[in-house]
Structures are given as C-alpha cells and as structure tokens.
A protein has these predicted regions:
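Short linker/helix segments within small regulatory modules
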Residues: 128-135
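Short metal-coordination and nucleic-acid-contact micro-motifs, chiefly zinc-binding Cys/His arrays
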Residues: 41, 110-114, 135
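Short metal-binding segments enriched for Cys and/or His
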Residues: 143-149
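A broadly conserved sequence feature marking short terminus-proximal activation segments
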Residues: 57-111
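Short cysteine-rich clusters marking metal-coordination/redox-active sites
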Residues: 117-120, 139-142
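Phosphate/anion-contacting hairpin/loop surfaces
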Residues: 1-48, 52-61, 67
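Low-complexity, intrinsically disordered Gly/Pro/Thr-rich segments
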Residues: 118-128
Length: 149
C-alpha cells in the first residue's frame, strides 16, 4: 500500500517509460502559474530541480516566467521529455552536464549569469522565481523577455 504523501507526487520522469501525458495533465491545473515554477513542482513531475529547470527551458526556448497556460500540450510534453532526457544522460554521476563542448562550460545557462549565451551572444540573466526564490538562469534573447512575477 502506498503512503498517502507519495500518492500526491507526480510521475517519475526516470521511470521506463515516464508518464509524460500525466505530467502535462497535472501542469494544466496550474494554468496561470509560471512554467519555471510548475516544472519544479514535485506533484506535477518528480525529479526536476534548478539545474534541469533552467537548462530544459533554455533548450526548449521557453520563457521561464511565462504562464504554463500559454503553452500547448505538445510544448509542455516537449519540456518534460527534454527534462527526462537530460536527467537520463546524467544518471552515471558527476560532473553533471547538459552541454558537451571540449574545455567549455558544462551548462548552457545555469550558473552563467553575466556571461554570453552560447547560442546568440546575449548576456545570460538570473532572476529569483517563486515563493522559495529559487534562481532561474535564462537568455532573454533566446527565451523572450521575462514577465513580471
């Protein structure tokens, strides 16, 4: 029998296969919430933390401060699919990486505030997001301007 608190958790993105449709369904209930907050909500999908949030949303070219309701189910599914792919690539341990370039940064945006974007050259920014004030790294040119919140 499952503990009642475990029943509230979203699908495990490292399950084989992960239930991405359930993650999208749970994300939909957060219509006005910022996608950067929603992807880290463990009752939506389990496993996405700060690094994977910033890296996934960058690779999917989504504004982390946009409302989840502004995105199609297909785009949301793409976010969860990308996150699970990045997490699977890093199952073998540290150092964790989402970008593979000799002698370069292991990340596209995470921890790179003030540095140039590898894709377009714009300056990577960091803003606090959500009630917990978690850091969110993003490229304002590749991902669109941040919205208030």
């Amino acid at each position: 029998r499952q503990h009642r608190l475990l029943a509230r958790l979203g699908p495990d993105l490292l399950a084989d296969p992960p239930d991405l449709d359930e993650a999208v369904r749970r994300a939909r209930y957060r219509g006005d919430a910022m996608i950067g907050d929603v992807v880290m909500a463990q009752d939506v999908a389990c496993g996405i933390g700060n690094v994977y949030k910033s890296e996934t949303l960058f690779l999917e070219r989504l504004d982390p401060f946009s409302p989840v309701g502004a995105h199609s189910d297909e785009r949301l599914r793409g976010v969860f699919d990308r996150a699970q792919a990045l997490m699977r690539e890093n199952l073998r341990g540290f150092p964790r990486a989402t970008r593979h370039a000799p002698g370069g940064s292991r990340y596209w945006v995470y921890g790179r505030s003030g540095e140039p974007c590898f894709a377009c050259g714009a300056v990577i920014e960091m803003r606090r997001q959500g009630e917990a004030g978690r850091s969110t790294y993003f490229c304002p040119a590749c991902q669109g301007p941040p919205r208030s919140g």
